[in-house]
Amino acid sequence: MAYRDQPLGELALSIPRASALFRKYDMDYCCGGKQTLSRAAARKELDVEVIEAELAKLAEQPIEKDWRSAPLAEIIDHIIVRYHDRHREQLPELILQATKVERVHADKPSVPKGLTKYLTMLHEELSSHMMKEEQILFPMIKQGMGSQAMGPISVMESEHDEAGELLEVIKHTTNNVTPPPEACTTWKAMYNGINELIDDLMDHISLENNVLFPRALAGE
């Protein structure tokens, strides 16, 4: 099956582990989820046929949960428990680790200078963002008022873009989240945690941008 003309966001939701494949190729399937596979591959100078072949293999596996057809209230509850609560645990721990690594290894050229600052910015932005969703937008959608939520949804999507930009800065600061040979245990653990955060946050944004928000605006 040809996947090149399908949007990345749709592929990430319909094919098991497609999101991990896109992460491997540094393709943005959350904020950039509306771009086609062909367009995204061209921008990264990648062979779209190779990626299509990998997607075809992944598509043979059964999908765990198809959120595209789940009730909106169920999607919202899942987002809060699986992503919001998790981000609230992840970021404070990563900030502590980054503070330690930047202090202890300040003299090393490979130290990720500024990482603590960027993680703190992401934590503050996400904390405010998630609170607005939980207190304003999500209740509107659960009450069947999603079609009237164009304003709040537009703001949330803009904030998703800002979070995505911060992730790019964090990846640049950490050499694409790759620890140097001299990295200590804390440094390696922190990078593992950052990779997990990036995976979670991209899946989180993808589910909202590509499923929850469009369906809510359509009046479901």
From Swiss-Prot:
CDD domains: Hr-like. GO terms for cellular component: cytoplasm. Disulfide bonds: none annotated. GO terms for biological process: protein repair; response to nitrosative stress; response to oxidative stress. Pfam families: Hemerythrin (PF01814), ScdA_N (PF04405). It is found in: Cytoplasm. Keywords: Cytoplasm, Iron, Metal-binding, Stress response. Its main location: cytoplasm. One of its GO terms (molecular function) is metal ion binding. InterPro entries: FeS-repair_YftE, Hemerythrin-like, RIC_family. Di-iron-containing protein involved in the repair of iron-sulfur clusters damaged by oxidative and nitrosative stress conditions. Belongs to the RIC family. YtfE subfamily. Homodimer. This is Iron-sulfur cluster repair protein YtfE. It comes from Escherichia coli O8 (strain IAI1). The lineage of its organism: Bacteria, Pseudomonadati, Pseudomonadota, Gammaproteobacteria, Enterobacterales.
